[in-house]
Amino acid sequence: MPKEHKKRGRREDQKKRKRDHDDESASKRSRKEDVDHVQAENPLQHVANHVPRQDAAPFYGMLDEQEQEYFKKADEMLELNQFESPEDRRIFLASVCKEAEGKELKMATSQTSRLLERLILLASEDQLKSLFQTFSGHFLNLVQNRFASHCCETLFIKAASAVSQENASIKTEALNTPPASDPDEIIVSMENLFLYTLGELEGNIGFLMTEKYASHVLRVLLVILSGEPLEKQAKSVTQSKKKEKVTVSGAGDERILEKRVVPQSFLEALEKVISDSVSGIEPHYLRSLAIHPLGGPTLQLLLKLELSHFGKSRAKDEKSIIHRLLPDNPIAEGTESAILINGLVYDSVGSHLLETIIEHAPGKLFKQIYGEFFKERMGSLARNEIAGYVVGRILERLGKDDLEEAMRQIVDQIPSLVERNRTAPIKTLIERCVAREVDCSPIKAQLETAYAGPHGFEVTRILKLNEDDGKPRARHGESNEKVHGSLLAQTMMTVDGPLGQLVFDSLANLSPELSIQLARDGTASRTLQAALVSRNATVIFRRKMIQQFYGKIGELALDPKASHVVDAIWYGTVGLAFIRERIAEELAENENSLRESQVGRKVWKNWQMDLYKRRRNDWVAQARTTAGNEVFQSFPDESQSDAAAPARNHRTSRHMSAIELARQKFAAAKAAQAKDGKKPKKGSNRTNGSSETPKSLVAQ
């Protein structure tokens, strides 16, 4: 009897379906429990729940497959920018813009938003206004969308400059791409379009401050309203570090905004946003917002704009952000304000808010906070990885007497700071001591001991170089340590005295192999570049340092990192014309390899090697003029102005070598002979290669 036909593996399928069902149920339970747990722990959820907003974002439709493929190819072509002529590019852009008409919302909420960003960067003022009107009524949903939020951010930044131009009555020239025309369209100013957008977001600011995507757009909008420049650092408070940078050839760097004059309506709107953002939040929820990963940076920006644009007297206003954060007067231990400050010091997010308070707070409030919480703790706080940056902000506001006291505390911790590779407080301390004219000798003594090696102070220990394997050490977190070490060494060299001389002497005593390694290291080479162009570097140091690279200039000029050192040698050969010619000869010997390399071509251009090859005499004359007259001046006489002498000899007045001292003594004897009436014979030459004092120097 034939058996019933059954599918093979049915038992496994049943088991798999059962496992999947159990996993899904467990996952749902787990997610629900996680949400409940977060809601219980995060008091900010209470604030968000009281903000009226739509439960589900509207659906704007999807592009069909042909449209998606077309826009994808258009995006690739704009990115590559391989058009045969500008006219072809203009025609292509016109066709893309025409195809995108009426589909802007679909594009903004899908992966084709990258193409829309590029089109915004290339858009004219009329096209920007048209897109503003298309997005009008949808901004609250768009700023919360993963893709559309980037389009809104780009649109705001691009349109911000147009506001200033409109107010200055400057008519901008339209781009080649014609805008979409509608006979029923009502043209409004860019200023009003921004204000309409704010009107859409009004009442939702508290929620948007902590929204994953909208919080970044909100910060950009606040900066635009204030007229402040838009920061573009990696850790800028206005932008996520994960944001992809979308660019397009021909648009320039339109994402950078300089400081601008904004209309009064913008400042009034900004003041209202600052007031509304915290008006409905209880004080304990506001303090929780200070340590929120998304709300914290927004609160920092609001506080900074409040104190910098509307006067530090607002600290007395009970409705201001600073007063609501720190309501107690005086701020004493045990108060709510004291609890907040002590909690922010060691928090990775909250410490940034505390830095903002310290930087922008009124003088009376700062002195109160410093005296109560930090004056006796500067040394211990400097050792902490997070609190060390707060210490740096405090040092920037201290007077000379308080700075000397803080220096004594921090100097005792320098060995511990060096051991932990936390050199940022030391760098800031040196900078402030120089600015306040505080003696740096205690810092020099501690650093000399902390970075001591078999041959005394070793700059390679600051720069984290390993002489044995010829490569930088590979270990976790070394990148930041190397950057901070390089910055510390560069700061030390700005000090005219024993502290800076530690670095110069150590660099001059490096072996040729280690000097080459230093030049090839991307981070450490910046210290070498700074040393070669430093005003405190003596002629002897620069000569000894540059001679370490003889025979290797061609190789270094081809290295992406070391090529910058070769460029710095041009400025480092001031007063060393013969060394400059020696380096140029070595570059000329490697002409073929340099011309074949993009890096090498830049070095060739910076050293003016085409002039060297074609008209060598002109190059030599120019090199000797720029490299010789800066330091090796003609001997002074009575015809030269006494006031001009220090300016002409600013290098020789510092760390004078034996030969320079001898020249100075000879010049003094020469001046004494002139006073006695003894003149040199006519035609005699007592100067370095010139028969008379240059007229330009006398004129000075």
UniProtKB/Swiss-Prot annotation:
Q: Per its UniProt record, what Pfam families does this chain match?
A: PUF_NOP9 (PF22493)
- Does the keyword field hold Chaperone? no
Q: Where in the cell is it found?
A: Nucleus, Nucleolus
Q: Do the record's keywords include Nucleus?
A: yes
Under the heading InterPro entries, the entry gives: ARM-like (IPR011989), ARM-type_fold (IPR016024), NOP9 (IPR040000), Pumilio_RNA-bd_rpt (IPR001313)
Annotated region (Disordered), positions in chain = 1-53, 631-700
Under Gene Ontology molecular function, one entry of this record is: RNA binding
For bias type Basic and acidic residues, the affected ranges are 10-39
Q: Where is the composition biased (Polar residues)?
A: 631-642, 685-700
One of the GO biological process terms: ribosomal small subunit export from nucleus
Keywords, A to Z, come to: Nucleus, Repeat, Ribosome biogenesis, rRNA processing
Spans of repeat Pumilio:
200-239, 336-371, 372-412, 509-547
GO CC annotation, single? nucleolus
At the top level, the lineage of the source is: Eukaryota
What is the predominant subcellular site recorded for this chain? nucleus
Which family, according to the similarity comment? Belongs to the NOP9 family.
The cross-references to PANTHER family, in alphabetical order and at most eight, read: NUCLEOLAR PROTEIN 9
Q: What does this protein do?
A: RNA-binding nucleolar protein required for pre-rRNA processing. Involved in production of 18S rRNA and assembly of small ribosomal subunit.
Q: What is this protein called?
A: Nucleolar protein 9
* Source organism: Pyrenophora teres f. teres (strain 0-1) (Barley net blotch fungus)
